[in-house]
């Protein structure tokens, strides 16, 4: 079993922890808790770079080793890092579990060392018709991020 963690922070008071687990070649499970967000849906993605020298802006685009258009987690055509939305309650917190086969913790397409980013707005899953729908899901600004690192 391989485990990883990302601790998310922002200058706007958002904080959270995402735990990643993968057994063998099975899909990766992500268990997340985050607080300090406005209620509603927020896009969240794995971004290509684990670089936070300029905050979340330096994490690069969505992780997309296959060069596909943006889509929903269940779509065949999607970035590997397209993880959809998290639902934030009225208290500003969210807890969630997802399982995804395109975010491995081992091998040549491992997400270790990359960043996870939470966005200000909902991800339209590539179906919104906006000029940014097919690249970012029109999910708005990057409000919190953390680097995915191996956990002992």
From Swiss-Prot:
Gene Ontology CC annotations of this record: cytoplasm
S-S bonds: 56-145
Keywords: Antioxidant, Copper, Cytoplasm, Disulfide bond, Metal-binding, Oxidoreductase, Zinc
Signal peptide: none
Residues where Cu cation binds: 45, 47, 62, 119
Cofactor(s) it depends on: Cu cation; Zn(2+)
Cofactor descriptive note: Binds 1 copper ion per subunit.
Top-level taxon of the source organism: Eukaryota
Main location: cytoplasm
Assembly and interaction partners: Homodimer.
PANTHER family cross-referenced by the UniProt entry: SUPEROXIDE DISMUTASE CU-ZN -RELATED (PTHR10003)
Primary role: Destroys radicals which are normally produced within the cells and which are toxic to biological systems.
Protein name per its UniProtKB record: Superoxide dismutase [Cu-Zn] 1
Organism: Solanum lycopersicum
């Amino acid at each position: 079993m391989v485990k990883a963690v990302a601790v998310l922070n922002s200058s706007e008071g958002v904080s959270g922890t995402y735990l990643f687990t993968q057994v063998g070649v099975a899909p990766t499970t992500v268990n997340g808790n985050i607080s300090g967000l406005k209620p509603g849906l927020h896009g969240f993605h794995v971004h290509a770079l684990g670089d936070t020298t300029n905050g979340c802006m330096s994490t690069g685009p969505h992780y997309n080793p296959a060069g596909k258009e943006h889509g929903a987690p269940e779509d065949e055509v999607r970035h590997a890092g397209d993880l959809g939305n998290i639902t934030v309650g009225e208290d500003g917190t969210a807890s969630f579990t997802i399982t995804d086969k395109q975010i491995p913790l081992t091998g040549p397409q491992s997400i270790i060392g990359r960043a996870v980013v939470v966005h200000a707005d909902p991800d339209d899953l590539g179906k919104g018709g906006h000029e940014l729908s097919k690249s970012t899901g029109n999910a708005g600004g990057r409000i919190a991020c953390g680097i995915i690192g191996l956990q002992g």
